[in-house]
Amino acid sequence: MVVAHSAATATTTPAATVTATVVMTTATMDLRDWLFLCYGLIAFLTEVIDSTTCPSVCRCDNGFIYCNDRGLTSIPSDIPDDATTLYLQNNQINNAGIPQDLKTKVKVQVIYLYENDLDEFPINLPRSLRELHLQDNNVRTIARDSLARIPLLEKLHLDDNSVSTVSIEEDAFADSKQLKLLFLSRNHLSSIPSGLPHTLEELRLDDNRISTIPLHAFKGLNSLRRLVLDGNLLANQRIADDTFSRLQNLTELSLVRNSLAAPPLNLPSAHLQKLYLQDNAISHIPYNTLAKMRELERLDLSNNNLTTLPRGLFDDLGNLAQLLLRNNPWFCGCNLMWLRDWVRARAAVVNVRGLMCQGPEKVRGMAIKDITSEMDECFEAGSQGGAANAAAKTTVSNHASATTPQGSLFTLKAKRPGLRLPDSNIDYPMATGDGAKTLVIQVKPLTADSIRITWKAMLPASSFRLSWLRLGHSPAVGSITETLVQGDKTEYLLTALEPKSTYIICMVTMETGNTYVADETPVCAKAETADSYGPTTTLNQEQNAGPMAGLPLAGIIGGAVALVFLFLVLGAICWYVHRAGELLTRERVYNRGSRRKDDYMESGTKKDNSILEIRGPGLQMLPINPYRSKEEYVVHTIFPSNGSSLCKGAHTIGYGTTRGYREAGIPDVDYSYT
């Protein structure tokens, strides 16, 4: 039995050992798993805490870090890792204050650093950055290496810095493959930066010193949609003809506050929607400037020198919704009759502002759409036959300043003794509307020193050569004056002429390149200026002006006469009053005045009732005449205790005042209650 038990015991011992070993191994593995889980949880919590930690000087809200307007000189180093937008504007941060660990914040996409103390383009920026605001700093250079560190950048704002053309490194934007918006307003640029990225959609270069735009300035910018060049030094002579025609996708072009005398040639027409040309010196617009601009919605020509517009200028503008024409010297003659009809026809769809007439005189200040009878005269003149009759019936201002000379941009004056002019001794009649002529001109003297010239060309011409000669002067001495006028013009104003002089005015059609048309004879007309001092001229001007023209002068004369008469009446009244006052002064007697009883209390002086009782009228005055006046005072003695005399002469000190003195020199008030 013992042996059997021992054997059984020996048999079960290994199995129990194996079971215990398995249990211990399982327990060890569970402990390791728990420790690993705990370590992982601690690391996760640490990362979460670190990512949500906000700098003490800032405010954080779902990835938006607000550290602006804090007076910081450097960016806080403990920026959360989940930050997406950093507001750091209006501080004093310089380039040394941008920490290197900022580029490790891979979630940051927008940084606002405007109005700080940066003098170089920052380099420690995260590669994930897509929008950067650096306005109102002192950044002077743009290096390729700086932009290469932020290849995903889409919007770059560098307004109000010190960037110049030479400080932009060549191919600085070569690595900016996604840049769509570039603002360089109010810097020191003298030309368009080169090497701009092809992805650019909006470019602002306003308020710089750009004076020249070469042909290749916008080469490759096929995606550009908005271009702003306001406030520069641009003139027509320094802009290449096809500069803007390459920008086929452009929808907005702004050339405000420049020195343009006419809109630039070959503007993009396919997709242009907004065209801003205000605040220039534009005096004429070629008739085909706005051709094929069927998408144009807004056109601003305010604050220029426009007096007229060519017929058909707006024919292709089917989508035009707003037309601004303020502050121009519009001359509302027959040449603008088409514009009046166009404004009336498109009144429901086009908002026209500022089309106010500055001449002729009788329509000054009127909106062109409200003019009726004045322009209807143009129809009457045309129906009576002959362009000469039309010129006679057309109302023209008597002031030469009302019409700005046309073609001034191309004007040149030269002495050409060999110019083909007819003999000055022949009396040349006014040109008539003969159908055989290719050019008909009409002249009309306006004032003693100006003549208005209008013409009509039967065939299109690139330009006209206009010449004039004062009779009595030989062409050999160089008195012929000429100018080149654009082919789309129909009128010209000669000024600074001699009064009471006869002029021969000739015009000839020019070919391309400003050469004379073969076998083309000049068309001439003769006109005589009025006498600047002649009474006949004055009478004629008054008759032409109508019966109402003399009213302002009559009003001025009548007002002056009435004013002189009023001064005479007032002078007579003043003289009479002065004389009457002297007579009354001599007869009137003035007496000394005595104060009322209440005046003592009002003046703060106590009355000695124990001594005097004064009775008298209210107010008396001291006489001017030396004779003695009657005494009007009644003095009653009340026998004071000291028995001193109460009578005082006129020479006694204090006589006539509110405070009397006794003979001993002691005031009465000191004895009032003794």
Swiss-Prot record:
Any one GO BP annotation for this protein: fibroblast growth factor receptor signaling pathway
One GO cellular component term noted in the UniProt record for this chain: neuronal cell body membrane
Disulfides per UniProt: 54-60, 58-67, 332-357
Expression across tissues: Detected in brain (at protein level).
Cell compartment(s), UniProt: Cell membrane; Endoplasmic reticulum membrane; Cytoplasmic vesicle membrane; Cytoplasm, Perinuclear region
GO MF annotation list: fibroblast growth factor receptor binding
Residue spans crossing the bilayer: 553-573
Outcome, altering residue 600 to F: Decreases phosphorylation. Nearly abolishes phosphorylation
SMART domains recorded: LRR_BAC, LRR_TYP, LRRCT, LRRNT
Membrane topology designation: Single-pass membrane protein
Keywords: Cell adhesion, Cell junction, Cell membrane, Cell projection, Cytoplasm, Cytoplasmic vesicle, Developmental protein, Disulfide bond, Endoplasmic reticulum, Glycoprotein, Leucine-rich repeat, Membrane, Phosphoprotein, Repeat, Secreted, Signal, Transmembrane, Transmembrane helix
First-listed, main subcellular location of the protein, grouped into a coarse class: membrane
Effect of residue 671 to F: Decreases phosphorylation. Nearly abolishes phosphorylation
Induction (free text): Up-regulated by FGF2.
Post-translational modifications: Phosphorylated in response to FGFR1 signaling, but is not a direct substrate of FGFR1 or SRC. A mutant where the Tyr phosphorylation sites have been replaced by Phe displays constitutive FGFR1-dependent activation of downstream MAP kinases. N-glycosylated.
Superkingdom of the source species: Eukaryota
Signal sequence extent: 1-51
Sequence positions bearing Phosphotyrosine: 600, 633, 671
Positions in the Extracellular compartment: 52-552
InterPro entries: Cys-rich_flank_reg_C (IPR000483), FN3_dom (IPR003961), FN3_sf (IPR036116), Ig-like_fold (IPR013783), Leu-rich_rpt (IPR001611), Leu-rich_rpt_typical-subtyp (IPR003591), LRR_dom_sf (IPR032675), LRRNT (IPR000372)
Annotated LRRCT domain residues: 328-379
Domain LRRNT: 54-80
Function: Plays a role in fibroblast growth factor-mediated signaling cascades that lead to the activation of MAP kinases. Promotes neurite outgrowth via FGFR1-mediated activation of downstream MAP kinases. Promotes an increase both in neurite number and in neurite length. May play a role in cell-cell adhesion and cell guidance via its interaction with ADGRL1/LPHN1 and ADGRL3.
Quaternary structure note: Interacts with FGFR1. Interacts (via extracellular domain) with ADGRL1/LPHN1 and ADGRL3 (via olfactomedin-like domain).
Protein name: Leucine-rich repeat transmembrane protein FLRT1
Organism field: Mus musculus
